[in-house]
């Protein structure tokens, strides 16, 4: 059967079509719209403009799915709508105008779906999974392919960019402010205090962008998905706006992460703090995550 999945995130709204046959599925195509819903949250309230952007994008996806007679559609939303004070009202407004039922998944559920999707085809049985989203960061530790701890932190690449960064790229002072909040938030996650030297499986746009920049800057193959954590601070330093960024670095940034120019450095700051907090030396990027985990758990698992 053909199954449409719509993931309404804080930074992007993604739609993918999967062919599901028995216990296996294949992604046939995907689309992405960089909407930046988290930037429409003012004083904790999702603004009408954000609702309008979500409606426009979902109606576009709905027309596409209808064209190919894909009637099975599941939509879910994460931090931007989940954490808004008017979450229920905003979701109901979007549902009413689009005819698409939206499931608001909790931070705990998001972390679980991340884990299921990202680790299904990986060889390492134990480690640390991190998903730095636009409005939240999910962390899961696992051993023998079983979840040990999981949490969702209220920090993300777009929320940091909106809160701290005045222009497109941050200044050194803005980087320090983001670093301080990331450290304080992560330090409060006491369940993880004893974990160290765990290899990180990273999912989401921040880690995808980190690998692209790492490969470009360190002359590695474009297909490489492994990143030494010691390189992250060096990568950040190349793109701080008041440290004399060169034209060569501007070209590298635009070539590697054209759709994440304003969020990649805030996301990398969170990644840097996490990797040092857990004394991790390596990150492996996985392009499977919450959508694939949702299929395994909510569609194939039922």
Language model feature labels by segment:
Residues 11, 71, 281:
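Short acidic/polar active-site loop segments enriched in Thr and Asp
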């Amino acid at each position: 059967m053909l199954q449409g999945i719509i993931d309404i995130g804080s930074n992007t709204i993604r739609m993918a079509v999967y062919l599901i046959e028995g216990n296996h599925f294949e992604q046939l195509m995907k689309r992405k719209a960089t909407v930046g819903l988290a930037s429409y949250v003012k004083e904790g309230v999702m603004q009408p403009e954000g609702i309008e952007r979500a409606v426009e994008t979902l109606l576009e996806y709905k027309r596409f799915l209808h064209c190919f007679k894909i009637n099975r559609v599941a939509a879910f939303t994460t931090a931007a709508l989940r954490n808004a004070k008017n979450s229920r009202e905003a979701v109901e407004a979007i549902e009413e105008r689009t005819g698409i039922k939206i499931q608001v998944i909790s931070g705990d559920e998001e972390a679980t779906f991340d884990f299921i999707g990202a680790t299904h085809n990986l060889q390492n049985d134990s480690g640390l999974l991190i998903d730095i989203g636009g409005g939240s960061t999910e962390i899961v530790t696992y051993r023998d392919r079983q979840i040990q701890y999981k949490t969702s932190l209220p920090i993300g690449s777009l929320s940091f960019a909106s809160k701290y960064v005045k222009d497109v790229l941050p200044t050194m002072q803005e980087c320090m402010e983001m670093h301080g909040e990331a450290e304080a938030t992560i330090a409060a996650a006491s369940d993880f205090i004893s974990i160290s030297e765990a290899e990180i499986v990273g999912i989401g746009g921040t880690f995808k962008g980190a690998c692209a920049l790492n490969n470009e800057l360190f002359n590695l193959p474009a297909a490489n998905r492994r990143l030494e954590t010691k390189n992250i601070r060096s990568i950040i330093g190349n793109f701080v706006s008041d440290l004399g960024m060169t034209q060569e670095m501007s070209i590298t940034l635009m070539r590697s992460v054209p759709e994440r120019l304003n969020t990649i450095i805030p996301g990398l700051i969170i990644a840097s703090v996490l990797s040092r907090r857990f004394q991790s030396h390596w990150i492996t990027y996985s392009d499977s995550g919450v959508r694939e985990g949702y299929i395994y758990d909510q569609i194939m698992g039922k």
